[in-house]
Design a protein with these regions (language model features):
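Glycan-recognition and catalytic cores of secretory/periplasmic carbohydrate-active enzymes
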Residues: 1-151
């Protein structure tokens, strides 16, 4: 079941951007935002599924998707203080960042508590599976933001 779920999730991977697209940009309320390839910080919670699918199946495709997504999120979703944007919209072909904003938070430049927690969990998980210290460092920076910004 985990591998089947990972196969399904992998259909949302956009190789040109190196990310897992969160929503269909042309449907429902998302269609009114002008997005092409919206990616939400919530997706960091999905990476464990991909790492586990690689462990269970031996297919490194899932691992590679998880690492690509984590790296692009690390590069583009965070402000200088390590708070995260809720949504980053990419050009799906080139990977260029088109917009950084919120869909459910207070404002585009506000920090969203759940999003910060998802980033913390996601990068801790990435470190656990890859042993790449950059993920542990990112998790620590996100933790420091959460700890030092209680309101």
């Amino acid at each position: 079941m985990i591998v089947e779920a990972a196969k399904s999730l992998s259909t949302r991977f956009r190789p040109g951007a190196g990310v897992i697209q969160s929503w269909d940009a042309d449907k429902g309320w998302q269609g009114t935002r002008g997005w092409k390839c919206p990616v939400i910080i919530d997706n960091m919670m999905n990476l464990e599924l991909l790492f586990e699918a690689t462990r269970l199946s031996g297919d490194s495709t899932y691992y590679n998707i998880a690492v690509s997504h984590a790296d692009r999120t690390l590069k583009n979703h965070f402000r200088a203080d390590y708070s995260s944007y809720h949504v980053v919209d990419y050009d799906p072909e080139t990977g260029e960042v088109r917009k950084r904003q919120t869909a459910q938070g207070y404002a585009d430049e506000s920090a969203w508590a759940r999003g910060q927690a998802w980033a913390l969990y996601g990068y801790t998980t990435c470190y656990r599976y890859t042993k790449d210290k950059k993920y542990l460092d990112q998790a620590q920076k996100v933790y420091n933001f959460i700890f030092n910004n209680k309101n």
